[in-house]
């Protein structure tokens, strides 16, 4: 997939609709009967990485769901995600090695927004420790195509092109990018993975800030994590109406 040029952030209307994240959290309870039918896991460790300006509290519902699906779900334990730095990347690497040693198994990485960019970098650096990567609304094709970057005056900084090119590179482990066309924070096109035998994109109808507790996104995560280690197949579809998830073919 060729690099995108001058991706625009989402419209101000979509940004205003981000408030629906609270409704998506409230909708999680009535969706539990649907989620009860998702596959259970094999107990392998999963490291969940929060988004920008968020911490482990924001991923509590996601981790609780994963534990109910029989995974060892772990927080990142690095406080608020204040943006990339060599220190954070180094400490995340230590956290990954710790979990690998503790469980004696490779670790699946689930990253929300900026957390997904961290997950991709970890998998690039230590593929031997990573089982698979799942990103939620993570703009790895162009991190600057976001309303946050625009408001902070960080759009098209020097070196941003080199960073985006590195982030776009396909990973050596199975990769699923979950995205929403109605995302109000980042351009959904900036979340598109280059499709391949072990790479895919899955679309849900969710806000950016609510994706980590959106029923359809949780169902996709459960489906992806439940695949036996060493095997992988593309996602097809799940759910109905607002809880619909389906694979997006980019070829």
How would you name each of these model-derived features?
Residues 28-31, 97, 101, 154, ...:
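Generic surface-pattern signal
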């Amino acid at each position: 997939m060729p690099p995108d040029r001058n991706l625009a952030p989402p419209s101000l209307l979509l940004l205003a609709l981000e408030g629906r994240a609270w409704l998506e959290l409230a909708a999680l309870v009535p969706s539990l009967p649907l989620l009860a039918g998702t596959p259970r896991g094999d107990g392998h460790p999963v490291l969940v990485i929060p988004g920008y300006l968020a911490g482990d509290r924001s991923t509590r519902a996601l981790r609780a769901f994963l534990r109910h699906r029989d995974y060892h779900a772990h927080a990142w334990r690095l406080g608020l995600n204040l943006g990339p730095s060599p220190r954070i990347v180094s400490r995340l690497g230590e956290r990954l090695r710790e979990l690998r040693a503790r469980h004696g198994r490779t670790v699946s990485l689930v990253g929300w927004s900026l957390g997904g960019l961290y997950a991709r970098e970890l998998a690039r650096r230590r593929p031997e420790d990573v089982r698979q990567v799942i990103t939620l609304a993570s703009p790895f094709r162009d991190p600057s195509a976001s309303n946050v970057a625009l408001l902070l005056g960080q759009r098209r900084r020097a070196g941003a092109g080199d960073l985006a090119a590195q982030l776009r590179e396909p990973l050596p482990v199975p990769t699923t990018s979950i995205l929403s066309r109605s995302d109000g924070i980042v351009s959904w096109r900036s979340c598109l993975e280059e499709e391949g035998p072990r790479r895919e994109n899955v679309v849900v109808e969710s806000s950016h800030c609510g994706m980590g507790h959106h029923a359809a996104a949780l169902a996709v995560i459960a489906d992806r994590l439940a695949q036996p280690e060493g095997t992988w197949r593309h996602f097809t579809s799940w759910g109905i109406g607002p809880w619909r998830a389906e694979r997006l073919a980019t070829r």
